[in-house]
Amino acid sequence: MIAVIFEVTPNKGSANRYFQIAEQLRNTLECFDGFISIERFQSLVNEGKYLSLSFWRDQKSVERWYALENHRAAQREGRNSLFKDYRIRVGEIIRDYDMAVGR
């Protein structure tokens, strides 16, 4: 399993457009082969900073999503006009357990 951590600080006045694009992409994302889940969080420390945490079956699924044209268009718009700053981290999950499954 792969985790993608996307941290973003939109430019002032751009957050609504960012969330609009994210909502549009979500419909495609939820049907995308290899996608598992996504959640979005707002920082309690850094005003205006958001984090999206998504989980994927494997690296190939992430690469196919990255290459999808409507996702590429959203990335371009983000970099060109919406984002003050962003950072993407991708990592492999080496352990996954919870109270129901145990260790």
Label the model's feature ranges.
Residues 78-80:
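Arginine/glycine-rich "motif VI" loop of SF2 helicases in the C-terminal RecA-like domain
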